[in-house]
Amino acid sequence: MDAQNTTSSAKPTVGSLFAGIGGFDLGFEQAGFQTAWQVEIDPVCRAVLSDRFPHAAQYADVRTCLSELKSVDVVVGGFPCQDVSIAGRRRGLAGERTGLFFDAMRIVDNLKPRWLVLENVPGLLNSNDGKDFQTVVQSLAECGYVGYWRVLDARYFGVPTKRRRVFLVAGLGEQPPFGFMADTGPVGRLAGKAETDSPWADAHPTLLAGFTIGSNIDISGANICLIPGGRGAMVERGRAVADDGLLKGLDAANFAAARAAGNAVCPPVARWIAEKLITTF
């Protein structure tokens, strides 16, 4: 353990870049880490972070916060994916948002955490004919980090959705635990599938009022699933997360809530990684 970051009686500390609503941070805290600080530019997400992680310091911009950040044992970050996603224009690391990776590495190079964990969409692997991923790996190496990468799917960690993300786990001059990213996720906890054999029908015009169908929705928003024997009544929409705390930042803005959750790192996946790393302290 790095003495400048933690003591023998303290929990290993984590600093979170591009923290979102704290998916990475939650998973690491569930494994026994303590979040020291979080950097997130979206004020809505920062409100959630402030509510859910009151013990952590919050900062807004990875480009300007370096002088305020304290040393930590682990830095985690799901850096922006918009410029490498197949749904975007794919400017890669030259893009304004995904290019913030270099600002993140400037922080890492200065703080020198023992471990670094990064996350992005699988599109990072083939962006710019694979050159962008080579640049990412080279940047880590130039800062003294060596490790592994692997694409992990959240559905194998008890989450009812297919969510493939590439994770890079690297140590400062040391490899992560042997076989770390060669292991499989807990495949015995494969999440149950949603019903796919129920009939579909056109939604009532009232349900479509003010609704815009996104370009990437697989099933038309004008269709709804009919549940055989179900009651023809409106029901309260369920959330994937609790409203308490979210409402303080989201103010009942459903779109903001969905976007924040959609951008978040899946906590069970983060926890699986964290449980491997905490054995090294």
Model region roles, listed by residue range:
Residues 13-15:
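Conserved beta-strand elements of the Class I
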Residues 27-34, 52, 273:
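A short, Lys/Arg-enriched amphipathic alpha-helix followed by its capping loop at the start of a domain
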Residues 35-40:
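Conserved SAM-binding motif I beta-strand of class I
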Residues 7, 64-74, 82-257:
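Class I S-adenosyl-L-methionine
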Residues 54-62:
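Conserved SAM-binding strand-loop segment of SAM-dependent methyltransferases
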Residues 44-47:
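Short alpha-helix immediately C-terminal to the canonical SAM-binding loop
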Residues 17-21:
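Class I SAM-dependent methyltransferase "Motif I" SAM/SAH-binding loop
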